């Protein structure tokens, strides 16, 4: 049943999976996240639609700025051009009842900030192969955007400028997706006016802190920060004041991840150091080069992306079960007929047959071959085929915390992620 409750005092009724609220061509099914710039809602289309959306609605106070509205729409349209398996797809930018919104694919999962927080709470780390794979896919998505061209083949020179854990989504199907790519440039020009940049300094590059011209290499540095933090479960840059934090970023004095995690190899230390080089000339010159080195390292681990799916479902076991239940209510579908990859335009809801017994893999089975990013010489980057979730999930293996012989060299820092991100789940 669809609720007819109107919005009051500029606020939207968030709705619920079993109590949808109309919003233009969509029905809102509950609030996903709220920030200083926008609110994000789970939504579906008209009755009978078999697809979920994430609808980002601009806060009313920002809509008073005409130039911001214009940029919001222009950058949203740019995001619609970013069709890559490692970037959340944007379907449309629109307006309804004086509210401006962006409709994106819905990804059932958690952002990387939440993953790091849960790892800290459970005294474990993201396994090294998983962290390497996630960083490689982040770099792949960045490279695709960096090399996007217009219809005449002219480079668009896109730079994200806001690559951070909160903008990386990990799905329960093991997908890695960059969020908010197309509107990053618009938001960064206005967020300082409403205090949103506070806390973002720790994911900026040295040249960004200095106010210098930026290119793709600034996103490489930010991706390096994320890699370092996944390997160590520690914030790389922090300070008691904003000025102190900015000085830390400007100097870019980076300890090797192996100082915190003995499972990090010298080769991985070297990759992190090159991505985090203070001077851009010493850094990876493209996100593709970073992705290539990370993918080469993954081959040595014989990592299967399905392991990330298992890790996410185990780490967020209760949340995953709730996701299945809410999705069934949202789409008026039986829970057993659902997969988490429900937002793909070509397929819609994936109906899963009865589970089959798991098939054991031979011990020497090689890892799945990973597509490389589009080359910079192509006029228009082409997205590699997306990773699809298998109908019958493999048995979840219990993730083990780091071995006791790997002591934390800085125990006083262990509570950082939990204390920083104490938010409502």
Q: Predicted regions: what is each one?
A:
Residues 39:
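Conserved N-lobe ATP-binding subsite of Hanks-type protein kinase domains
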Residues 44-52:
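Conserved N-lobe loop of protein kinases adjacent to the ATP-binding glycine-rich P-loop
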Residues 57-81:
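AlphaC helix of the eukaryotic protein kinase fold
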Residues 93:
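Activation-segment/catalytic-loop signature of the eukaryotic protein kinase fold
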Residues 97-111, 115:
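Conserved short submotifs of the Hanks-type protein kinase catalytic core
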Residues 140-158:
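Protein kinase catalytic-loop region centered on the HRD/HxD motif
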Residues 166-169, 202-352, 422:
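C-terminal lobe helix-coil module of Hanks-type protein kinase domains
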């Amino acid at each position: 049943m669809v609720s007819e409750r109107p919005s009051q005092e500029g606020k939207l009724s968030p709705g619920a999976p079993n109590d949808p609220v109309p919003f233009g061509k969509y029905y809102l099914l509950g609030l996903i996240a709220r920030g200083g710039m926008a609110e994000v809602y789970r939504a579906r289309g008209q009755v009978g639609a078999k697809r979920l959306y994430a609808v980002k609605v601009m806060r009313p106070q920002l809509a008073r700025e005409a130039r911001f509205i214009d940029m919001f729409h222009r950058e949203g349209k740019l995001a619609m051009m970013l069709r890559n398996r490692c970037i959340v797809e944007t379907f449309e930018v629109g307006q309804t009842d004086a509210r401006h919104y962006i409709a994106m694919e819905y990804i059932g999962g958690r952002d990387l900030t939440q993953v790091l927080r849960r790892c800290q709470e459970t005294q474990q780390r993201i396994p090294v192969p998983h962290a390497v794979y996630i960083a490689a896919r982040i770099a792949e998505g960045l490279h695709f955007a960096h090399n996007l061209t217009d219809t005449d083949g002219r480079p668009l020179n896109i730079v994200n400028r806001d690559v951070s854990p909160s903008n990386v989504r990990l799905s329960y199907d093991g997908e890695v997706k960059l969020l908010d790519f197309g509107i990053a440039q618009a938001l960064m020009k206005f967020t300082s006016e409403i205090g949103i940049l506070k806390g973002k300094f720790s994911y900026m590059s040295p040249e960004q802190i200095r106010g210098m011209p930026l290119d793709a290499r600034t996103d490489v540095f930010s991706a390096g920060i994320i890699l370092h933090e996944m390997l160590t479960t520690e914030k790389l840059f922090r300070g008691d004041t904003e000025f102190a934090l900015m000085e830390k970023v400007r100097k870019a004095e980076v300890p090797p991840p192996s100082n915190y995690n003995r499972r990090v190899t010298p080769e991985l230390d070297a990759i992190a150091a090159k991505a985090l080089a203070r001077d851009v000339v010493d850094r990876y010159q493209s996100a593709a080069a970073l992705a290539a080195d990370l993918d080469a390292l993954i081959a040595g681990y014989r990592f299967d992306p399905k392991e990330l799916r298992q890790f996410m479902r185990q780490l967020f076991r209760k949340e995953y079960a709730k996701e299945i239940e809410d999705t069934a209510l949202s789409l008026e579908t039986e829970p057993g007929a659902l997969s988490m990859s429900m937002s793909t335009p070509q397929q819609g809801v994936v109906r899963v047959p009865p589970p089959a017994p798991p098939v054991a893999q031979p011990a020497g089975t090689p890892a799945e071959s990973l597509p490389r990013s589009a080359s910079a010489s192509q006029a228009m980057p082409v997205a590699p085929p997306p990773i699809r979730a298998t109908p019958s999930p493999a048995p979840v293996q219990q993730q083990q915390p780091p071995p006791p012989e790997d002591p934390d060299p800085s125990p006083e820092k262990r509570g950082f992620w939990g204390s920083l991100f104490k938010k409502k789940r």
